[in-house]
């Protein structure tokens, strides 16, 4: 007697709703990973927000806060503020401690000399009326405190320490200034030491009673929208300006994201009207600075 053929049992199929739920969970999981890595950001629910390029929106935008010191030591919290997208400029508030500011000033005082500028024809440093401050350079890794500051700057900029020049400490007295200029080079000599300058970090080591702003005359946007507009000197109102505040660090890029030079990074130091201005500058190059 012939055996009946065995009937093949079909495996139970997942319902369409189950498959959809699985896909949704996977998509949400991927989105959470991207948000955590900072690659993707969730849309803002603020209905009153302006367009991204509006200075009213991007000024005073807090991107990061971290506990740092307390009210007694006067160091406050560290937080990052977007100043401009053209040029790309950011202020890291309370980047330095009071002690670090005083340390850099004390290191520089014994060797201060009249500041110079780069001659575009020869690549050498020369005297110029456009720069009337005094200053000195500190070797990279001059001491443990300087090295700690330099490493922190690299963490802030994501540029290796070896791509940076040594810190330059500057002192401006009443009436002293630095006319608007670009930090990138126009000569063929200076680029041999590490390529073109890509970014600048300017740290303010002292408060200034009046004047001494860092001004960007070619910045895009309505520069009068900044909340500190009424505090600016006449020079400071000639462009987008940053007030010199002790412990703050200003980062701006001399190159665009496509590695082309950014003319809007034109900047200058306004004359000090009242008080003294101490600052420290770190220039970064495309390659290792030799």
UniProtKB/Swiss-Prot annotation:
Cofactor stoichiometry and binding remark: Binds 1 Fe(2+) ion per subunit.
Protein's name according to its UniProt entry: Probable prolyl 4-hydroxylase 8
Enzyme Commission (EC) number: 1.14.11.2
Essential cofactor(s): Fe(2+); L-ascorbate
Family as reported in the entry's similarity comment: Belongs to the P4HA family.
Residues annotated as domain Fe2OG dioxygenase: 163-286
Positions bearing carbohydrate: 46, 222
GO molecular function: iron ion binding; L-ascorbic acid binding; procollagen-proline 4-dioxygenase activity
Entry membrane topology: Single-pass type II membrane protein
Signal sequence segment: none
Function comment: Catalyzes the post-translational formation of 4-hydroxyproline in -Xaa-Pro-Gly- sequences in proline-rich peptide sequences of plant glycoproteins and other proteins. Hydroxyprolines are important constituent of many plant cell wall glycoproteins such as extensins, hydroxyproline-rich glycoproteins, lectins and arabinogalactan proteins.
Annotated positions binding 2-oxoglutarate: 277
Intervals, Cytoplasmic compartment: 1-19
GO CC, alphabetical: endoplasmic reticulum membrane
Residues involved in Fe cation binding: 181, 183, 267
Residues spanning the membrane: 20-40
PANTHER family, sorted: PROLYL 4-HYDROXYLASE 11-RELATED, PROLYL 4-HYDROXYLASE ALPHA SUBUNIT
Localization (cell): Endoplasmic reticulum membrane
Catalytic activity annotation: L-prolyl-[collagen] + 2-oxoglutarate + O2 = trans-4-hydroxy-L-prolyl-[collagen] + succinate + CO2
UniProt lineage: Eukaryota, Viridiplantae, Streptophyta, Embryophyta, Tracheophyta
Pfam families for this protein: 2OG-FeII_Oxy_3 (PF13640)
Key words of the record: Dioxygenase, Endoplasmic reticulum, Glycoprotein, Iron, Membrane, Metal-binding, Oxidoreductase, Signal-anchor, Transmembrane, Transmembrane helix
Main location: endoplasmic reticulum
Source domain of life: Eukaryota
Gene3D superfamilies in the record: q2cbj1_9rhob like domain (2.60.120.620)
Segments on the Lumenal side according to the record's topology features: 41-290
């Amino acid at each position: 007697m012939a055996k009946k053929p065995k009937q093949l049992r079909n495996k139970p199929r997942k319902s369409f709703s189950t498959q959809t739920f699985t896909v949704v969970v996977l998509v949400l999981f991927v989105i959470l990973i991207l948000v955590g890595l900072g690659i993707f950001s969730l849309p803002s629910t603020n209905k009153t927000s302006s367009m991204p390029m509006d200075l009213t929106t991007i000024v005073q935008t807090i991107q990061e806060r971290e506990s740092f010191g307390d009210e007694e030591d006067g160091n406050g919290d560290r937080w990052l503020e977007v100043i401009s997208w053209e040029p790309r400029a950011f202020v890291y508030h309370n980047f330095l401690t009071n002690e670090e500011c005083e340390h850099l000033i004390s290191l520089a005082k014994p060797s201060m000399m009249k500041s110079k500028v780069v001659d575009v024809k020869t690549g050498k440093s020369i005297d110029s009326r456009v720069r009337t401050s005094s200053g000195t350079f500190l070797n990279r890794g001059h001491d443990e405190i300087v090295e700690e500051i330099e490493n922190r700057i690299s963490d802030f900029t994501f540029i290796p320490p070896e791509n940076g020049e040594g810190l330059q400490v500057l002192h401006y007295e009443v009436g002293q200034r630095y006319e608007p200029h670009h930090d990138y080079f126009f000569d063929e000599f200076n680029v041999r030491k590490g390529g073109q300058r890509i970014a600048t970090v300017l740290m303010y080591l002292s408060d200034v009673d009046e004047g001494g702003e860092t001004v960007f005359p070619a910045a895009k946007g309505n520069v009068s929208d900044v909340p500190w507009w009424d505090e600016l000197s006449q020079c400071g109102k000639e462009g987008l300006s940053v007030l010199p505040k002790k412990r703050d660090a200003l980062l701006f890029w001399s190159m665009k994201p496509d590695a082309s030079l950014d003319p809007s990074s034109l900047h200058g130091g306004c004359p000090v009207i009242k008080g003294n201005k101490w600052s420290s500058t770190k220039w970064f190059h495309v390659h290792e600075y030799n």
